[in-house]
């Protein structure tokens, strides 16, 4: 029996997981976790261990990204792509859309299906890795996501409420992992519109696999996660995150579109435009990322309450 003990307090029996995959009992391995929890490094080492067990010269497993912002080209430092970390392991659904466009969950579900079928069609093991709870559930639950039509009557009613009331109402209806949603009244109203629609029209499953995902969650203590976030933020600022945002603007990406992506791109853009000082930007951004990581964990705990079994490890 092969244990994967170097990357977690819970020894993962990778050979047993692989046997379950080969027997059709598991058809996808998913590594999820909040930001700065080490999930990418964990997923890469997992793929390497699968390759070793397979005894092949080429990678026997490939990674599908489950990140809502790493799809955009040119948004590298701010989204933490860290592509060098993948080494020889192939990855999918990174750098597939232009910065300034608005890639959505419907496109992701379609692209995930294509990547999954490509990987499994070549006899490789698919490993989904990411922290975007909505994207992960869209891929692993096989939901048939509806194209929600506008409800003008509901919109007019919600427009009468202030943004704080709308935030509270949305928080009661569904967890939000994209922090930029909560900063725009228009986007909150749209999210509420979708939530109310889904209550009246229950989401059904598609016929697409996977149906039996083995979930591995990477987590560290709250204190360590905060320290990692702060350290990584300073590293990214030193590596040129501000210059990256300036370059995107110089290449024609509208500041409003960058701010739409939230977190790093919202606050760094405001700094570049002179709206915030450097210290204000650094403080507000760090706080926003801390809150974002908390919401990610809330989403994953919600998955567990809905019946998903997540095997938690501490990288």
Label for each model-derived stretch:
Residues 3-315:
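Phosphate/pyrophosphate-binding catalytic cores of soluble transferases and nucleic-acid-acting enzymes
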